[in-house]
Amino acid sequence: MGLALFAERKVEAGVSVFAGQAAALPGSDAERQAQGLDHTEVYPLMMFAIGGMMLFPASGDLLTMFVALEVLSLPLYLLSGLARRRRLLSQEAALKYFLLGAFSSGFFLYGMALVYGYAGTLDLGGIDLAIRNGSGNTGMLTVGLGLLLVGLLFKVGAVPFHSWTPDVYQGAPTAVTGFMAACTKIAAFGALLRLLYVGFGADRWTWQPVLGVIAVLTMLVGALLAVVQTDVKRMLGYSAVAHTGFLLTGVLGAQAAGDLAVGQVTSLQAVLFYLATYSFATLGAFAVVTLVRDASGEATGLDRWAGLGKRSPLVAGAFAFFLLSMAGIPLTAGFAGKWAVFTVAMSAGAWPVVLVAITSSVIAIFFYVRTIQVMFFSDVAEGTEPAAVSVPSMLTSGTIAVAVLGTLVLGVVPGPLLELAADAGQFIR
């Protein structure tokens, strides 16, 4: 579905939504000359990013993981700055993303060096064996793990490494935003699970309390700051931060195999299932955002969405359904996903974190329902031009339809995907 959003680039009288030339300064002669050209850089960059995302969670050692991190990150830095409209905002977001991403990569690399100094290997299995044997300086191991987590938590958008998320979500082309929101988060959490469960599973008493604090801060900051947003894409950015906290709550549910009851949902199952449910709702939501436009491009101001339910009830209804899933309303995939991660966290004794997660979910319901209220029960303010809904292409319509179907089916029948997630968990282990 993320690929479908990329493929649908010509939405304004046949003109690409991406900038005509990546290296051109906004408003320059070079940009005006390239304005009508197809932007062929987009597809190679996207394929490089996908290659890195596939390698990232499959890495068996820290060096390969670092290379995959860079392969997926560098194309995203460029793609974030390619919006044809609002070029300055897009390039500002890309620059912030690049600078902060470079720092996080440096932390990850330094953490690799410290872990190698402790274990004498970068292989995740070898690191786990060294921890179990108790060899080396444990202080070096702890600092090294902390620096590795900085690099990965930046990619998933956890507090306090989240500041890039709302800016990039707002400034990047919406197709890129949807791609990043779903695919990058899946790849980054896959790598995080592999690092913690395979390489540092024997040291979980060290990283679980730290992740617990980060999860609490991430959920509260994401939910509270989303309440005051007036831009739809920026609101979804802070919503993504809150969902990162919910996913980290599931990671806290890691337990030894012997501690699990028969048939109990594992932490891996819960997190992978939540990632699937979140991806359906997120890709569907951003697909809808690409359709709501005005003469200057995408209309993402919340006041412009007033009365959208009257002008285009199907599009507004689909967006409302995705928001209800993100809120965790029963009979949606989001409810099943939150139930899974909260259950495994409770079984591992992380009930204080679960209480904060429930509180954050209640706060999040406010801004989701507020958006629905604006679309269906509000009129456009006097002097404000209402946003129109462009005619969706086959690819965009298919993306929204598949997202709606997936969100509904996973909310009603979550069992098959949970079983599939259990099998996928064997790969991560």
Ranges and model annotations:
Residues M1-R429:
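Alpha-helical transmembrane segments of multi-pass membrane proteins predominantly involved
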